[in-house]
A protein has these predicted regions:
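Glycine-rich phosphate-binding loops of nucleotide-dependent enzymes
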Residues: 1-160
Length: 160
């Protein structure tokens, strides 16, 4: 019952009702399917899921429980290549739904370029650049993700 985790469906008096297991299983399967994930067992323990499956489960839960904004802070860190692609595909599917804003925080230029429609680049808490993906070329993104002008300053300093 990973999907409901603290928000279980209960029928009967508050605190004394019965969990609606079949209904929770149905909803879990349905909601995961909406973002393209087919699960064999909605009761699979979280500990047996891959990192990508865990991230996808968290995203599906947020959508089901009414999130208007998903803030994804390095959602692919500590994942293998296959799991990274699984999570990125899920993010793209959510993006196509069109009713949820996604804030992706990443240090991975490739992932940013695959997902972003607009960028804001920070360095030490300061905005060093921003723009739409249609306005920024690959070199702009690379330069800003590596620290913008500050990286040039560092290069000069290291040459001294």
């Amino acid at each position: 019952r990973n999907f409901f985790l603290g928000r279980e469906l209960i029928k009967g008096p508050s605190g004394f009702g019965l969990m609606q297991m079949d209904e929770m299983d149905r909803i879990t399967t349905e909601e995961m399917s909406k973002i393209g994930i087919n699960i064999a067992n909605p009761n699979q323990p979280v500990g047996t899921m891959s990192g990508g499956q865990r991230q996808t489960l968290a995203i599906a839960r947020a959508i089901y429980f009414g999130a208007k904004i998903l803030i994804l802070d390095e959602p692919t860190s500590a994942l293998g290549q296959k799991q990274q692609m699984e999570v990125l595909k899920t993010i793209k599917k959510v993006q196509r739904l069109g009713n949820i804003a996604i804030i992706l925080i990443t240090h991975n230029e490739i992932h940013a370029r695959l997902i972003a429609d607009r960028y804001t680049f920070l360095s030490l808490g300061e905005v060093i650049g921003s723009g739409l993906s249609s306005e920024l070329g690959g070199e702009d993104v690379k330069r800003l993700m590596s620290g913008g002008a500050k990286i040039g300053d560092l290069a000069q300093e290291l040459e001294l």
